[in-house]
Amino acid sequence: MVQEQMKLTGTLEGHTGWVTQIATYTRNDKTTVLSSSRDKTILVWDVDSVAPVDEGPIGRPVRSLTGHNHFVSDVVISSDGQFALSGSWDKTLRLWDLNQGVSTRQFISHTKDVLSVAFSADNRQIVSGSRDKSIKLWNTLAQCKYTITDDCHTDWVSTVRFSPSNRDPVIVSAGWDKVVKVWNLGNCRLKTNHIGHTGYVNTVTVSPDGSLCASGGKDGQAMLWDLNEGKHLYTLPGNDVINAMSFSPNRYWLCAAVGSSIKIWDLEDKKEIEELKPEIASSGSSRGSSPQCISLAWSQDGQTLFAGYTDNIIRVYQVSIRASN
């Protein structure tokens, strides 16, 4: 049987703060990468299709999107690749025209840091989560259409995501109250509370077919939930704080940023198949420890994994065939 492995092929270097989120878009075999950072910017990268042999830089920032005046916590790309959406600790969201490289809308309503943002599958609706403990729904004109308060989180809302389907769409949210919540988009009412985490939840990710989601956070447990049945499926041990998660777009893999490592599980047999660690001299990062991996994104073809770290670097891994013994 052919075995696949992840191989570090290079880096993207340009941020001067932690890389808080990464988003990708591919058109005509050309991948555009966006990254948000604590340096208050969003960088747009051109990524080389051919990786260098020395594992050095494999792309360059071609544009810097500026406007936020505090850490940028999240960035996503519209499904047509024309727009980006960002959230910041400056309490606002911004919509960006990627062709022009300018912010076209500023979304003002949250009273505290915006921690997470997302586009609906049809790009017509926007959701945001904040330290003000609220979830807000917006249109693309930056009008707040609804604020979820009934049954909402009792602590910071750390992450919000739409299901990828336009049919019976839901929003999945999680927060520092240790709860993962699923909301009906049609009426903004709570559909399910997923309870099981023993610490704050940092991240949720929804599978490409919308049938399940995974959550992770302080307790180091990757929990899988059935979104259709509204039940817990199983738990995978991360053994350290989980900062980010992403399903592969075309393999039955779940990828998690766990402390300084990246763990990849094959969900078919529920086994960890890979653990990726940055090879870095400990003196090169703060507190003499390895940089933490805090953001993850796959390319749309599932061949490339982009990982953002607290040493301000994006490391780029590619799926390759493992050499047989």
Curated annotation (Swiss-Prot):
WD repeats lie at residues 5-48, 58-99, 100-141, 143-186, 187-227, 228-268, 269-320. It comes from the Eukaryota. GO terms for cellular component: axon; cell body; centrosome; cytoplasm; cytosol; growth cone; kinetochore; nuclear envelope. GO terms for biological process: antifungal innate immune response; chromosome separation; defense response to fungus; embryo development ending in birth or egg hatching; mitotic cytokinesis; motor neuron axon guidance; negative regulation of translational frameshifting; polar body extrusion after meiotic divisions. Keywords: Repeat, Ribonucleoprotein, Ribosomal protein, WD repeat. Transmembrane segments: none annotated. It holds the Pfam family WD40. One of its GO terms (molecular function) is translation regulator activity. Required for the expression of antimicrobial peptide nlp-29 in response to fungal infection or physical injury. Belongs to the WD repeat G protein beta family. Ribosomal protein RACK1 subfamily. This is Small ribosomal subunit protein RACK1.
